[in-house]
Amino acid sequence: MAEGVFPGAIGIDLGTTYSCVATYENSVEIIANEQGNRVTPSFVAFTPEERLIGDAAKNQAALNPKNTVFDAKRLIGRRFDEESVQSDMKTWPFKVIDSNDAPLIEVEYLGETKTFSPQEISSMVLTKMKEIAEAKIGKKVEKAVVTVPAYFNDAQRQATKDAGAIAGLNVLRIINEPTAAAIAYGLGAGKSDKERHVLIFDLGGGTFDVSLLHIAGGVYTVKSTSGNTHLGGQDFDTNLLEHFKTEFKKKTGLDISGDARALRRLRTAAERAKRTLSSVAQTTVEVDSLFDGEDFEATITRARFEDINAALFKSTLEPVEQVLKDAKIAKSQIDEVVLVGGSTRIPKVQKLLSDFFEGKQLEKSINPDEAVAYGAAVQGAILTGQSTSDETKDLLLLDVAPLSLGVGMAGDVFGVVVPRNTTVPTIKRRTFTTVADHQTTVTFPVYQGERVNCKENTLLGEFDLKGVPPMPAGEPVLEAIFEVDANGILKVTAVEKSTGKSANITISNAIGRLSSEEIEQMVNQAEEFKAADEAFAKKHEARQRLESYISSVEQTVTDPVLSAKIKRNAKAKVEAALAEAFSTLQIEDASTDDLRKAEVGLKRAVTKAMSTR
């Protein structure tokens, strides 16, 4: 890599199933990985020798299912006991364990059992995306804008930011995926003048968002947002997988539920069938020797696939209704419905949405897999002063808090301080008081959600305001100040008005939240893993080079024409050097140095033997 640091910030769409990276240098460029793919699987695999990330990890998943990790985005910022985590664990081949109610992933790596947090797995994917960008730019990348689902809560946003820090990135901003896609749409095809209401429908591999924006000139104002952080292509695959499992059991009497490898192979076939059914009405699925020597073969029609997923497809319209209701806008006032995310390629999803908007033509002008990274790269250029075009220079993003924020009051009633869909950054205040006489300490539990009963919402953290003057209940005036920054991350301060005593919390003690020490430790660990990966790659390369050189020397020695060029008395020396090099190659744990020395030694013997006779 060339010296120097990239002055801008890359845009990374950190997806559940695939990730994408873009840069801005005079214009946006989506960067392909070393396989030439513009999206990279969000997979990390661990083997006895190495760690693989991206395509290489996904390609070996069926052979190594228990140590191939994916779906980290479905774990990040969540508690172990959450319903979605427990149900996902039933479908994952890798092991998830409970560590103080935070989920950890357990794998075998370099011959040892190791555990990783979802943040660490995500950081490995982010590192991969950073390296893909660096290979193209030729400079070191230090800054990034990373996207998250609009409906991610505070804990999930903070955990994503931590993943960036572990990857050695300064995450300038966490932005919402549909908002990033809106930028890509707004900047495309000279659409930036007309004032319009745009609905972004973003259905990806694991998450679903709907955002309603008002775009006027370069000002993008999010009016409302809704979604489901646990709905996407993976769920459609799972339903199809269950259908195929039942078919296989009917035909053979065999149940593959306990076999991780068979499940992985069948899931891959289900995913392929799902994609094929977006363009044809019927497809055949074949998996040789799926389980116990039995082959699997089945025909699936698009109609059957739609039937299997009917309830999930239909559920995508609920957030659409919600955003219209929240923004107080009639569906007839929506100028464009923009499709984002790979799962919007499914014809039934498109039909339901078009029918909902009275047969409206859906907007498909942007690439559903790349739009989010595109928008993130534009935002990265703006934040680092690298944007050159007039239309990006004046671009302004006004996003919203996706869920209400507030405190738990007496009787577990949720006291909303920041209503959902409030434009961020924002500062909101609300006054509270004591519930008992002479109360000197007041606990402020901070929640996020839409339910009146606090237990139904997400507890983000809590803190105590001490030193409240002892007064009769109801007399002290306690003010809660909620500050939400542009990343959607919250800081809460409580002040007792008569004394000015205050206490505050940046929501950092939520379950699974990493301390700065833990992040630092993980950064160092990530460096070690990177060094181990590089050492393995060098050793692999040295082994391959030695192998290929041995092979070419063997050809020379056995070829009558070529061997005639070797000095008469030197042939034995070449053969001895060849035998020595071959024996080094046979040593499984031969070091990179030993392999290189063997190659140099053999080259020396050949050069001497071939020098003018």
From Swiss-Prot:
Documented EC number(s): 3.6.4.10
Q: Per its UniProt record, what Gene3D superfamilies does this chain match?
A: 1.20.1270.10, 3.30.30.30, 3.30.420.40, Actin, Chain A, domain 4 (3.90.640.10), Substrate Binding Domain Of DNAk, Chain A, domain 1 (2.60.34.10)
Recorded protein name is: Ribosome-associated molecular chaperone SSB1
Q: Where is this region: Inter-domain linker?
A: 392-402
Q: Which reaction does it catalyse?
A: ATP + H2O = ADP + phosphate + H(+)
Q: Where is this region: Lid domain (SBDalpha)?
A: 516-612
Residue positions annotated to bind ATP are: 16-18, 73, 205-207, 271-278, 342
Per the record, GO CC terms?
cytoplasm
Q: Which PANTHER family match?
A: HEAT SHOCK PROTEIN 70KDA
GO terms (BP aspect): translation
Q: Map motif Nuclear export signal onto the chain.
A: 574-582
Query: Gene of origin?
Result: SSB1
Matching entries from PROSITE patterns are given as: HSP70_1, HSP70_2, HSP70_3
